[in-house]
Design a protein with these regions (language model features):
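Short, acidic/small-residue loops that bind anionic groups at enzyme active sites
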Residues: 89-105
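Short, glycine-/small-residue-rich phosphate/pyrophosphate-handling segment
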Residues: 102-146
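ATP-binding N-terminal substructure of ATP-dependent carboxylate-amine bond-forming enzymes
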Residues: 1-91, 130-163
Length: 163
């Protein structure tokens, strides 16, 4: 079953595909992606469109997508409000819990050498990291580093302004 990765114009989307070791990927973005043989692409509305959630769900159902990996913070926040709807259709949003998002309001966009993908607290791809108990029930894509002997982590996101 295919997965959907947003921010399809970004190098982070293709890096995530490599980390996931999946070949059946649909890359989605707000702009038309270049036609690359063997790569499935999709144009989606911007996060602030009234039809964003509806179009994302429709795309998932049309393409039999089982997991969505949003790489833009605004998409994460919009999709978090529709978590139950996607769940009804057995589409997993690979984003942290509402509680985690609420308590991590200073989410920074940064690129890290270390990326881990978690599903309900279990590592499914990426680089193992210390202190898993900090994210023991979370899903999503996280970047992490040890800076001055302190473990730091954040969501793995793209910088919208850079695109």
């Amino acid at each position: 079953m295919p997965v959907l990765i947003t921010a399809g114009l970004s190098p982070q989307a293709y890096r995530l595909q490599r980390i996931l070791h999946v070949s059946d990927v649909v890359f989605a973005d707000n702009s038309q992606l270049p036609g690359i043989p063997g790569i499935s692409t999709l144009v989606i509305p911007t996060h602030d469109s009234a039809s964003f959630v509806h179009e994302m769900l429709k795309a998932c159902l049309d393409h039999k997508i089982t997991k969505v990996y949003p790489l833009k913070l605004d998409e994460v926040m919009q999709l978090s409000r529709a978590r139950a709807l996607f769940s009804e259709y057995e589409v997993m949003l690979m984003i942290p819990s509402d509680d985690w998002l609420k308590h991590h309001t200073n989410i920074n966009v940064g690129i890290s050498e270390n990326i881990v993908v978690l599903e309900n607290g279990k590592q499914i791809a990426g680089t193992s990291f210390p202190n898993n108990f900090l994210l023991s029930k979370e899903s999503g894509i996280f970047s992490w580093a040890i800076i001055e002997q302190k473990f730091e982590y954040n969501l793995y996101l793209i910088d919208d302004a850079a695109l």
